[in-house]
Amino acid sequence: DDAVADGEHAISGVVDS
């Protein structure tokens, strides 16, 4: 998905926690 939310990457919906 697109990097919209804070902590989210432009990769395949990978959330950086």
Curated annotation (Swiss-Prot):
Its main location: secreted. GO terms for cellular component: extracellular region. Keywords: Secreted. The keyword Secreted applies. It is found in: Secreted. The keyword Amino-acid biosynthesis does not apply. Expressed in skin glands. Belongs to the Frog skin active peptide (FSAP) family. Septenin subfamily. May act as an antimicrobial peptide. This is Septenin 1k. It comes from Osteopilus septentrionalis. The lineage of its organism: Eukaryota, Metazoa, Chordata, Craniata, Vertebrata.
